[in-house]
């Protein structure tokens, strides 16, 4: 479908949403709008739940476009009682963590693997269980990965910590700040995964709104691609922007960027975790 956008001052532009019909867009809007200002519902949960729903309604659409062009613009239009742009900045990162957990845990449970989104004090507790709290800043991991019958510091259910996820809606979120923590985690034999929606577009009048991301290509890599392919600063990177170019079969570091939908089935991310934690 074609989504028309009004930027004010007479500046109007449009963006094409592949594999999204007008009926599907309306279905997503009808679900999300009542959640945006729902009392006692955290914005991170509203956005996370709506993203999972949107990817179910439009399984062949680009997940990053659904986030960037559909949910973000609905939220900015509908949010009241606060600056909507600042509210989105504050909460959207945690919303992505919520969505990762909600989407993948039903699939990973079959393999004895569990994800837990970490908020506030939970981050420090997770790093303590990993044995790296004294060397890693308390905000440098977003989602904990656990394996039943393995890992460090098993809980009462037998789930031990085997790694963590650095979740980034956009790679403009100073991903380089996570690299020291990631290297420490990997040095301890823990997985340190970068998961991203790789959101990046440029608005008019100079941009065309196409959400191309920031990872470049294997032949023309950006600095951020080199964090993974060149320097091996993360165990792996998973992008949910279908315009992201995946890594070639061989990279200088042996680490790879994978590109995936968000359908809730076995995919590159689940296959990777199962293989690594077998």
Curated annotation (Swiss-Prot):
EC number: 3.1.21.4
Protein name: Type II restriction enzyme AgeI
GO biological process: DNA restriction-modification system
Family note: Belongs to the BsaWI type II restriction endonuclease family.
GO MF annotation terms: type II site-specific deoxyribonuclease activity
Enzyme class per UniProt: hydrolase
Catalyzed reaction equations: Endonucleolytic cleavage of DNA to give specific double-stranded fragments with terminal 5'-phosphates
Keywords: Endonuclease, Hydrolase, Nuclease, Restriction system
InterPro entries listed in its UniProt record: RE_BsaWI
């Amino acid at each position: 479908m074609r989504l028309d956008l009004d930027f004010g001052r007479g500046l109007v532009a449009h963006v094409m949403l592949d594999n999204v019909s007008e009926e599907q867009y309306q279905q997503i809007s009808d679900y999300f709008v009542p959640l945006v200002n729902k009392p006692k519902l955290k914005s991170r949960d509203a956005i996370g739940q709506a993203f999972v729903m949107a990817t179910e309604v439009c399984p062949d659409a680009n997940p990053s476009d659904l986030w960037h062009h559909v949910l973000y613009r609905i939220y900015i239009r509908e949010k009241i009682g606060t600056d909507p742009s600042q509210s989105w900045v504050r909460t959207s990162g945690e919303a992505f963590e919520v969505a990762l957990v909600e989407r993948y845990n039903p699939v990973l449970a079959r393999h004895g693997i569990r994800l837990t989104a970490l908020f506030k004090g939970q981050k420090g507790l997770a790093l303590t269980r990993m044995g790296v709290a004294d060397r890693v800043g308390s905000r440098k991991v977003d989602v904990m990965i656990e394996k039943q019958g393995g890992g460090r510091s098993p809980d009462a259910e037998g789930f031990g910590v085997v790694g963590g996820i650095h979740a980034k809606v956009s790679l403009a979120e100073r991903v380089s700040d996570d690299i020291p923590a990631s290297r420490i985690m990997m040095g301890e034999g823990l997985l340190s995964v970068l998961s991203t929606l790789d959101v990046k577009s440029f608005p008019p009048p100079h941009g065309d709104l196409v959400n191309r991301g920031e990872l470049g290509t294997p032949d023309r890599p950006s600095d951020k691609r080199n964090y993974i392919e060149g320097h091996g600063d993360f165990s792996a990177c998973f992008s949910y922007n279908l315009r992201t170019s995946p890594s070639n079969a061989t990279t200088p570091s042996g680490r790879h960027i994978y590109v995936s939908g968000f359908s809730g089935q076995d995919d590159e991310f689940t296959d990777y975790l199962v293989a690594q934690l077998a």
